[in-house]
């Protein structure tokens, strides 16, 4: 599935000195082109389809629970005084049940869920745990700290003379056509990734490597979950790949049902605000290129009336949202790093029998999407688990 407006944006980016590329995984990701995606026969592909179903389904030693939530991990004191993770307490939807581990426990609840579970289990900043009446198993100040995310700044441009999803899905007939094409052919807008066209470039020429990533979409809306706009438009979503802002994930009570306090602290540093303003200027430069001229792009958000760095940084915060790449809250690190929760094999320092395998282990956010790096980390961890338990 290709869109004229996306092809024109790619050509405009090339005219603005962002080179064309057909492969973002060739070593240098700088350039503009169509993303490689996790998709097969019109369906999104995932780890369950690629790993669990062909390998684990039907095995007598594999059991998968859905609709369940870990309330806490269980620890026992060993004869030498160390603490070992021996299982988990799980809410299965009707009652709490205890699951015991004979070798080790692998926690993979993500960069938000894993620190929450660790803190509820007594592994985390001691003052936070005591505040909520939780016994301290391990004082680990790094648990829940160092939260990083890619903040996408969603610039919207009204256009004319090109089909967009806004127009195609604006009527019941249009929606029916889209649905019918997907049912019959597994193609069309319902088969596409949220963003098809991407680009990696620099916010300013003095940058050593690309520090911006674009996700360009043939649609627009006020916020995720809201209706599409009634006018034809595209969204040029740009994020700072290397943010310096750091946030946190901290429990608000000792109840597993209560969501933690998530403080991403977006745009909290001068550097991040500077890059935000620069990134919107890069977007404007691309939109002004000849390749897009015939579609008469009109900046709708943030609006051409905003020109100063201060205004652009402020407006960036108003039109931005997470791109769902939280990392870093259980980071791996060196032995002499007091904030390192995990060692180089993803084992939790200070206790035995427990690993964390998810994006929270990344000490610094990747310069691109986090999905594939997390899968690669999981594959490495699988090998380490086998080696360490021989």
Annotate the PLM regions.
Residues 5, 9, 47-51, 113, ...:
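Stable alpha-helical elements in mature extracytoplasmic
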Residues 72-179, 188:
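Glycine-rich loop(s) and the adjacent beta-strand/alpha-helix scaffold that form part
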């Amino acid at each position: 599935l290709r869109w004229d407006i996306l092809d024109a944006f790619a050509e405009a980016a090339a005219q603005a000195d962002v080179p064309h590329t057909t492969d973002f995984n060739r070593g240098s990701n700088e350039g503009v082109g169509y993303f490689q995606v996790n998709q097969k026969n019109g369906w999104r592909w995932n780890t369950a389809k690629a790993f669990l179903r062909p390998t684990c389904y039907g095995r007598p030693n594999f059991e998968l629970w859905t609709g369940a939530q870990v309330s806490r991990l269980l620890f026992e004191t060993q004869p030498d005084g160390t603490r070992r993770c021996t299982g988990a307490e799980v809410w299965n939807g009707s009652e709490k049940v205890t699951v015991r581990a004979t070798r080790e426990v692998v926690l993979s609840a993500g960069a938000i869920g894993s620190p929450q579970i660790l803190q509820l289990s007594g592994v985390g900043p001691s003052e936070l745990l005591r505040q909520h009446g939780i016994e301290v198993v391990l004082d680990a100040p790094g648990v829940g700290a160092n939260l990083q995310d890619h903040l996408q700044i969603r610039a919207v441009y009204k256009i004319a003379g090109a089909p967009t999803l806004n127009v195609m899905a604006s009527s019941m007939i249009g929606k029916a056509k889209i649905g019918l094409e997907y049912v019959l052919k597994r193609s069309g807008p319902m088969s596409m990734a949220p963003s098809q066209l991407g680009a990696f470039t620099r916010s300013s020429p003095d940058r050593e490597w690309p520090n911006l990533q674009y996700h360009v979409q043939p649609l627009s809306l006020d916020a995720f979950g809201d209706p599409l706009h009634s006018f034809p438009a595209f969204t040029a979503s740009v994020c700072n790949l290397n943010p310096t802002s750091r946030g946190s994930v901290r429990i608000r009570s000792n109840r597993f049902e209560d969501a933690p306090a998530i403080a991403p602290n977006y745009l909290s540093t001068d550097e991040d605000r500077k890059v935000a303003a620069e990134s919107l200027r890069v977007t404007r430069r691309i939109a002004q290129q000849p390749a897009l001229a015939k579609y008469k792009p009109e900046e709708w958000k943030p609006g051409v009336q905003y020109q100063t760095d201060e205004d652009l940084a402020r407006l960036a915060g108003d039109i931005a949202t997470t791109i769902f790449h939280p990392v870093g809250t259980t980071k791996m690190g060196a032995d002499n790093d007091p904030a390192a929760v995990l060692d180089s094999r993803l084992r939790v320092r200070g206790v035995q029998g427990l690993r964390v395998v998810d994006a929270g282990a990344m000490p610094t956010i990747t310069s691109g999407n986090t999905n594939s790096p997390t899968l690669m980390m999981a594959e490495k961890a699988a090998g380490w688990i086998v080696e360490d338990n021989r």
